[in-house]
A protein has these predicted regions:
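OB-fold single-stranded nucleic acid-binding module
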Residues: 405-411, 513-542
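Short beta-strand micro-motifs in enzyme catalytic cores
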Residues: 364, 397, 484-488, 532-534
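Accessory interdomain/linker segments of ATP-dependent helicases and helicase-like nucleic-acid enzymes
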Residues: 437-498
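Residue-level recognition of well-ordered beta-strand positions that form the cores
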Residues: 434, 489-491, 501, 520-522, ...
């Protein structure tokens, strides 16, 4: 069995048929009937009425990439279906905040809306939808987030998370649900012939990867074929953004979406308004697309600078909290749109759950990141009597509280951690190898080419990790302006050497020549000045 076959087997792909199905995703075979989703028939019927009567439709999106992608999908498709009046509203993180709000509904009314179609939001917005109804505005909800026991008072609520339906795949993202609405409308309206909806898959892929939903079933096929659409550069905005980000279209993969396009789009909503990102997605000519993309690049550079500044300040606080099991850091000058990213970086550095809180006068808003058996959402609930509001899930949560209660909150979440009597939580942060190897004999370009066939990588289909059980450090080289990166050369038992690279490496990666180590890594190809060499992306050393 080759190393590649061992990796596939480690993923449960042990038969030829299973491997074939996985490595060659079939769009048609997982194009599930959209009418199996709850309320899809009601949604289509209401949209047919709007189409026939020329009503004004406002697509109400979310400011994250999934919401923006879903908004762009419906703007594109509704235009082809011939809807006469269609607009979009993206809430501002710093003005309206997350989800539907009463103030946002007023703004949508002022846009002349007869019908709101939500994307990536709405399932829990009962009061806001009721308010829109009192203004004579109907609402069709399309969403994928968790739901309440009772559905919202909308004309339709299309969400695979609702119980009691027969749709076979529940982990669609907001863009995926919007795409199902398009597929359903294709059966009732002219303008977008069957098969032509596939040109929307670049947007579906963007939302799916960046919202970190499971890359299985329909999601895997949508992203696989969405990347093929993206390579053809049919959308001026994404073509320009790839150029600005230095991404070669013919080589674009899921990693480029998550770490190249995604951060640039998110920077707009984190610092100013996500409308800039929507302008890029919907740009109709090259100049407009380039201007929008350059604006996103400018904001992303600014975002990185702000993020680095907050991270440094947070580290100064965290360094004085060595006895705390949960880090709670706070300041009155931290940008609320960036603190979530910083929380993730703090978890990576300190190997502890983190709450990072930005004060705004008497009130403070925080973002949490956690891992293992310590649920961020449960920690928030444990402080229910201290906070104003909060919620989330195991790995991430948000909280709003009075600024004067931050110290009380810090004590409470640490007491909650202690009450759980958790052991060895940092082990959850270590990489887990798909396969252990005892030499580098099969780490070559053929393996790299085969691993590329497993794309797209993401949640539920992580990039494969290998562990070399015994190797000797042959060379150590510090790199970067501050010596923060490391390039190690490791030698196996057969004297075969492989270079491994780690950016912003922890100090324990800087080993001595002659050290015996085990290394967890991902095989990659380094291309430099026309030369290709196989190396490893170093993840962990022991």
């Amino acid at each position: 069995m080759t190393l590649f076959e061992k990796i596939l087997a480690a993923r449960g792909l042990t038969t030829r048929a299973a491997c074939e199905e996985f490595l060659n995703p079939n769009y048609a075979s997982v194009k599930h009937d959209p009418f199996l989703l709850p309320d899809m028939k009601k949604a289509v019927d209401r949209l047919k009425k709007a189409h026939a009567e020329g009503e004004k439709i406002v697509i109400y999106g979310d400011y994250d990439i999934d919401g923006l992608s879903a908004t762009a999908i419906l703007l594109d498709a509704f235009g082809k279906f011939g809807f006469k009046e269609v607009g979009a509203f993206i809430p501002n993180r710093f003005v309206e905040g997350y989800g539907m709000t009463m103030g946002a509904v007023d703004k949508v009314r002022n846009m002349g809306a007869d019908l709101i179609v939500t994307v990536d939001t709405g399932s829990l917005c009962h009061a806001e939808i009721e308010y829109a109804s009192s203004l004579g505005i109907d609402t069709v909800v399309t969403d994928h987030h968790n739901v309440a026991e009772t559905p919202p008072p909308s004309v339709a609520a299309v969400n695979p998370k609702f119980p009691g339906h027969k749709y076979p795949f529940r982990d669609l993202c907001g863009a995926g649900v919007a795409f199902k609405l398009v597929q359903a409308l294709q059966t009732e309206l002219d303008g977008l012939p069957d098969g032509y909806e596939k040109w929307l898959l670049d947007l579906v892929a963007l939302g799916t990867v960046c919202d970190i939903v499971t890359l299985a079933d329909e999601n895997r096929a949508n992203v696989y074929w969405g990347l093929e659409v993206l390579k053809k550069q049919r959308r001026p905005g994404l073509k320009a953004l790839m150029s600005v980000a230095g991404i070669e279209p013919e080589k674009v993969n899921a990693r480029h979406l998550g770490f190249g396009l995604g951060p640039r789009m998110n920077a707009a909503g984190r610092l100013e308004t996500a409308q800039y990102a929507l302008d890029m997605l919907t740009a109709s000519d090259g100049l407009e697309a380039l201007e929008a993309s350059e604006k996103l690049e400018e904001l992303n550079i600014k975002r990185r600078s702000i993020q680095d500044e907050i991270f440094d300040e947070a580290c100064q606080q965290a360094d004085n909290m060595t006895d705390d099991r949960v880090l709670v850091v706070n300041s009155d000058n931290w940008n609320h749109g960036v603190i979530g990213i910083v929380a993730s970086k703090l978890v990576e550095k300190y190997k502890k759950p983190v709450f990072i809180i930005g004060e705004r006068g008497d009130e403070a808003t925080g973002s949490a990141r956690s891992f293992g058996d310590f649920s961020a959402a449960d920690a928030v609930r444990a402080a229910d009597d201290i906070i104003i509001k909060g919620g989330g899930h195991g790995a991430a949560a948000g909280v709003t509280l009075a600024t004067e209660r931050i110290d009380d909150f810090r004590r409470r979440v640490n007491e909650f951690y202690d009450s759980l009597q958790l052991k060895n939580q940092e082990l959850y942060l270590l990489p887990r190898a798909d396969v252990e190897i005892d030499d580098f004999s099969e780490i070559n370009e053929e393996l790299i080419d085969n691993l590329a066939k497993m794309e797209p990588f993401g949640n539920g289909n992580a990039e494969p990790i290998l562990k070399i059980t015994e190797a000797t450090v042959l060379n150590v080289r510090r790199m970067g302006a501050d010596g923060q990166h490391v390039k190690l050369t490791l030698r196996d038992k057969n004297d075969v050497a492989l270079q491994m690279l780690a950016f912003n490496a922890p100090e324990e990666f800087f080993r001595e020549v002659g050290d015996e180590v085990s290394a967890w890594f991902q095989p990659t190809v380094n291309e430099w000045q026309g030369m290709r060499s196989v190396e490893g992306r170093l993840l962990h050393l022991a």
